[in-house]
Each structure stands twice: as C-alpha cells, then as structure tokens.
Swiss-Prot record:
Belongs to the serine/threonine dehydratase family. It is an enzyme of class 4 (lyase). Residues 338-409, 432-504 form the ACT-like domain. The keyword Lyase applies. NCBIfam families: ilvA_2Cterm, PRK09224.1. Its cofactor is pyridoxal 5'-phosphate. Gene3D superfamilies: 3.40.50.1100, Biosynthetic Threonine Deaminase, Domain 3. Pyridoxal 5'-phosphate binds at residues 88, 187-191, 314. This is L-threonine dehydratase biosynthetic IlvA. One of its GO terms (molecular function) is L-serine ammonia-lyase activity. Transmembrane segments: none annotated. It comes from Pasteurella multocida (strain Pm70).
Length: 513
C-alpha cells in the first residue's frame, strides 16, 4: 500500500491526515447538503440531508472503494482487485477500477438479481456468480485473491476504506459549521467510523449518532458485549446494512468516537423513505433512509428542539417494486395508522353499529368474513394522528363492549394476515405456523415449494406476496401432532431456509385458528 495509513489501527490524527490527502474526488462528487424544510417545521429542528444518492453509483460506497484502490502500489494495481458483494460496494469497486484502468472481479451470490449483476458489468466489472449467500461468495473471493495474487477490497473493515468514507464529514463541516448532531447509518460500520473519527478531530462538540435496524444491530450488540459478536440472524429489508458482525477496526473506532446508537424498525424506515420523497423528491433505498428514521426517533425520545441535525441518504439503489411495500407500511411507521382486530356480535345491525361508534375516524382498511352465528372477527385499519388518538379509539370501543387486540406492531399481521382474512378452517386442526425466508429470483417460489414438499406433513395454510426485495417471505401452516414437532423442526433445519415458529402470533390466533 502507498497510502498514508501504515498501521492496522491508525490514530485519530492519522485518519485525519488520510482524509485530507484522499484522492476520492478523482471519481466521487461533493454531494449537496439539502434543507428538509417540511420536516424541520414538523420536528422543531433544522434538518438537513446529505445526498450521497447523487454519486455516480448512487451510494457513498464509491468513496471508500476508490480510496483504497487508488492507494495500492503499482504492483498491486497491475494484478487487479477483487471483491465480494451483491450491492453498492460491488458497483463502487467496479467503477473505481475502471477509472484507474484496472481489472476488477466481483464475486456475487448465485441468487443475485440480474439488475445488480448488470449494474456491475455496466461499470466495467467482471462478475463471477458463486455460492448460495454472501459468506460463500466472500470465501470464494478471498480464495481467488490468494490464487490469482489480486487485492481483496473489503466493504468496510479497512483503514483506507474508513478514511474514504470520512471525506463525507469534511464536506459536512464545509457546508454547515453549525451542526449539532449527525445521524449515520450503520451496517459494517465503515461510514460511521469514518465520519465519527474525522468529526471528533476537528469539532468534537458535534454529536455523532449511529442508527441501526433493530434486526441487524451488530454495533449495538458489540458495544454491549465490549467486542464484535456474531448475530444469529439479520433482517433483510434494509439489505444495505444487513451485516451479522461489525468489523474489528470499525468497531474500535466507533467504540471510541460514536456518542450514541439508536435502533429503528422497518415501519419507521418506510416512514423515513416517504419523508425524504416529500421533502427533497428523492427515493431512498431502505438502508439509505435509515439515518433519517433514527433522527426522527431520537428527537422524539430525547425531546430535542432548536438544533441543527444532519442525516445521510447513503444510497438509492432499490428495486422499484419495493416501493409497494414501503407505501403500505409507512403510515404505521409514522404512527398515522392503527390496525385492530375487533370481535363484534354476529347479528343484523352490529356491523353498522360498529361503524357508527367509529364515527368520522377515517377507515383505511376493513376486512370481514362470516365465521359462525355467535360472533364475527373484523380486521380494521384507521388513520390516526398519533398514539394518543389510537388509545382514545381503543378506549371508546372497549367502553362500548368490544373485545379487541391492537395489531399495529404485529409483524405477522402486517405482512401476511391482513391479506388472508377469509375465515377459519371448519375442521379442528393440530397446526403450527412458520415464517420462512428464501432468496428472490426466477423460479424461487417453485423451488421453495418443491423443497418444502419433501415433507410428509400436510400444509394447511400458505401465504406469499412479492415485495420487490432480494428475499421473499412465506407464511405456512402444517398439520402436526405434538409428538411430530421435534422431528419436523429437525427436518426444517436440514432444508436450509431461515425460519421462525410464529404459532403464538395474536393475529393468527384471532383470524385463522
């Protein structure tokens, strides 16, 4: 390497020097810092968004990739570079190598959507499809790096990559010197580490807040444990930050310089995607909206007013059909919609009476199916202004004698059951309900069904709906006796799909049992 970082664990001053001498602007752009006027008024703070979606590859990843590749020795450059990625890092490496006239080989999992493969090839990268997941692709890339004497370019855990991402912080200070807090998305930690170490060298009074998805919180868990640890599984909606283990160097830097970490869920991310569109007319990928989701939550939880707050739109490489899912979930994430399961008497006029009690509350969704002569279960969505109004509606219904369950935070209800209202089985079943994940690609659902069909247990309920993501989600019920349960779960382990037993879901119990 010929860059300024000669240590595996540089000091803050060494990182600062590396950022100041970085060559990232050979290929990267100085991206705008835009005012989010509507959101600023709503939150009582000055909110700004750093538009990294405006980079040539539509994400910040170009900075770190180019910083490392440009710093290679002439001998290393002559041998070419290799990386493993199914996302933004792949495009950053491909474009960086193309700009420098180098060979770039990107190893991508075999189930990578063709749109992402084509994007890498469009930036001049060679693509090798290998392995069923990222870990297998990465292992192959490291093997090829050794056998072909190519340099492996990691997505986050390298000082040169961290320094490249840190160039964003330098731009922020030049664009607005009055910043109070910067909210940064965290996956492997490269962006958070780069921004934090630079900020704390120059303006340590600025707070740097890491934002993680609740189901991919590798930094939060590492900070609690005092060291990087492996997560058992990660959520895949915000795939750009779906990392099982934070990097060793990124953790060291984040542990030293990050001020706090906030966790958000998928619905809060969806609401942030909507906010970004409404304020600056940009469409962020889920991980790209992560830091804004964290900003909004942090402001509310800590009652922050009158400050200047910055969030980073880290990327905008998303499948268009993901927007359908975002649109459906953003109202719940903004606490503008409540989902309720309500029991009403099965008699003439009871349905109308229920509607009268709701009064002028806007109804967003209403599903009903006759079940028996005694009572009916209805699934109702109502538009609300916040938690207080939701509780008022719940209290009003309960005071009128209705039994109900709030399903607003029930993921099985939001993802599956709301599309399945149609009555219970007429036959009593010994049934267990499972949620499965499988890679989305042509023929993937058929392959899943064929694999699942290898069981001799009867499928009693099934729901699948495409959301434009890299992974699909299926809800399936099986007729199982208690004595079959251990054998069945052992069989599921052998199938290789990520799964979860969700038999105790309130939505399932209310509508499908």
């Amino acid at each position: 390497m010929v860059n300024n970082l000669h240590s595996a664990h540089p000091t803050g001053a060494e990182y600062l020097k590396a950022v100041l001498s970085s060559k990232v602007y050979d290929v990267a752009q100085v991206t705008p810092l835009q005012d989010m006027a509507k959101l600023s008024e709503r939150l009582g703070n000055k909110v700004f968004i750093k538009r990294e979606d405006r980079q040539p590859v539509h994400s910040f990843k170009l900075r770190g990739a180019y910083a490392m590749i440009a710093g290679l020795s002439a001998e290393q450059k002559a041998s070419g570079v290799i990386a493993a990625s199914a996302g933004n890092h792949a495009q950053g490496v491909a474009l960086s190598a193309k700009h420098l006239g180098l060979r770039a080989l990107i190893v991508m999992p075999q189930n990578t959507p063709s749109i992402k493969v084509d994007a890498v090839r469009g930036f001049g990268g060679e693509v090798l499809l290998h392995g069923a997941n990222f870990d297998e692709a990465k292992a192959k890339a490291i093997e090829l790096a050794e056998s072909k004497n190519m340099t492996f370019i990691p997505p986050f855990d390298h000082p040169a990559v961290i320094a490249g991402q840190g160039s964003i912080a330098m731009e922020l200070l030049q664009q607005n010197s009055q910043i109070d807090r910067i909210f940064v998305p965290v996956g492997g930690g490269g962006l958070a580490a780069g921004i934090a170490v630079l900020i704390k060298q120059l303006m340590p009074e600025i707070k740097v807040i890491g934002v993680e998805s609740k189901d991919s919180a590798c930094l939060y868990r590492a900070l609690k444990a005092g060291k990087p640890i492996d997560l058992d599984r990660v959520g895949l909606f915000a795939d750009g930050v779906a990392v099982k283990r934070i990097g060793d160097e990124t953790f060291r830097v984040c542990q030293q310089y990050i001020d706090d970490v906030v966790l958000v869920d998928g619905d809060e991310i969806c609401a942030a995607v909507k906010d970004i569109f409404e304020n600056v007319r940009a469409i962020a990928e889920p991980s790209g909206a992560l830091s804004l989701a964290g900003l909004k939550k942090y402001v509310k939880e800590h009652n922050i007013q009158g400050e200047t707050l910055v969030n980073v739109l880290s990327g905008a490489n998303l499948n268009f059909h993901t927007l359908r899912y975002v649109s459906e979930r953003c109202e719940i994430g903004e606490q503008h919609e409540a989902l309720l399961a309500v029991t009403i008497p099965e008699q003439p006029g009871s349905f109308l009476k229920f509607c009268h009690i709701l009064g002028h509350v806007p109804v967003t969704e209403f599903k009903y199916r006759y079940a028996d002569d005694k009572q009916a279960c209805i699934f109702v969505g109502v538009r609300i202004t916040g938690q207080e109004e939701k509780q008022t509606i719940i209290n009003q219904l309960q005071q009128n004698g209705y039994d109900l369950i709030d399903l607003s935070n029930d993921d099985i209800a939001k993802t599956h059951v709301r599309y399945m209202i149609g009555g219970r089985s007429n036959s009593p079943l010994k049934e267990r309900l499972y949620s499965f994940e499988f890679p989305e690609q042509k023929g993937a659902l058929l392959k899943f069904l064929e694999t699942l069909g290898q069981t001799h247990w009867n499928i009693s309920v099934f729901h699948y709906r495409a959301h434009g993501a890299d992974y699909g989600n299926v809800l399936a019920g099986f007729q199982l006796n208690d004595e079959d349960l251990d054998a069945f779960n052992q069989h599921l382990e052998k199938l290789g799909y990520v799964y979860q037993d969700v038999t105790e879901s309130p939505a399932y119990r209310y509508f499908l049992v």
